[in-house]
Amino acid sequence: MHSGTRPRRSLETVAVQPPRALGVIVGGGFVVWAAVFSALSARVAIGAPAEFKTFLAGLVAVLLALIAVVFANWAYSVWSLAYVIDRDTLTIRWGFREVVIPIDTIQRMVPGRTLDEAHVQGLNWWGCHVGAADVKRVGYTLFYSTHGSPDELLYVVTTEESYALTVLDQAGFAEKIQARAALGSVDPHVQRSAATGVAAFPFWRDRVAIGAAGISALLCAVLFAYVYASYPALPNVIELSFPALGGVIRVGDKSELLKIAYLGGGVLALNTVLGVVVHARERAAGLWMMVSGGMLQIVLIVAAVLAFQRS
């Protein structure tokens, strides 16, 4: 009875996780740094009068917030890094990405201590080495590693790609792979790398869509910069030509003109979010929403120039 249950247990799905604490701490440190300075810049921008320096403070706050989000994603990816061995595949889990390696495509496993140290191009900080390198005797290799020294690396060479993993118990890891390889695969699998969750949106792989969203954001920044730079020179009470009211002349507080910039920001946010969602179902419609957002920014820039010149 015992001899019959041992093979079954040995072929259960096994998740091997490398040491991740250092990588998460370093990545989290960048998140905290960017978030703190973003909050400080936002506080300056929110409490200051409308002028170009206020625009710069707001821009810095937004950029630092984006940096914090990016590093938070990378820190989460380090925390979630795992090598999952099931019946037919070895799956590398890295954040919102999974790399599936059929076990029957694995040709050999090479301990890192037997090879020269590689210089990884990609994400590189203490406890995080994710990217690619040309490794002597192995070739082009994808790294999903948190290693502190080459001794912690295990190179998995397949018929298509080579991978560098951080495995402390390399003998045990190799035994698990070899046990499954000896039995042969039950179901056919294709070696692939796939995004999951929010990273699976087609938007992230569409350079045209990313470019359209980026240009819209840049035009929105130009709109804010012009409005905030021109605002201090206006008198407190001005003639308002925006919005147009069929030739009716209005007078009011100059703060009314700030609504042009706020409208541009709202249009950018709405069109970008809806564009990304729609793009997942219909690429052309999603692209049109992002492009139209940029066109509306141009219309608002022209409206702002005319409104300020007439005020």
Roles of regions detected by a PLM:
Residues 1-56, 144-147, 151-180, 184-206:
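N-terminal membrane-targeting/pre-transmembrane regions
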Residues 2-16, 93-162:
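Non-transmembrane, membrane-adjacent beta-strand/coil modules in membrane-associated proteins
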Residues 14-80, 197-230, 256-309:
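Alpha-helical transmembrane spans
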Residues 68-115, 242, 247:
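Conserved beta-hairpin
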Residues 80-87, 170, 233-238:
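Juxtamembrane/interfacial segments flanking transmembrane helices
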Residues 87-96, 117-128, 265-279:
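Alpha-helical membrane-embedding segments
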Residues 101, 165-166, 250-252:
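Short capping micro-motif at the N-terminus of alpha-helices
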Residues 230-257:
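Active-site and channel-lining beta-strand-loop segments
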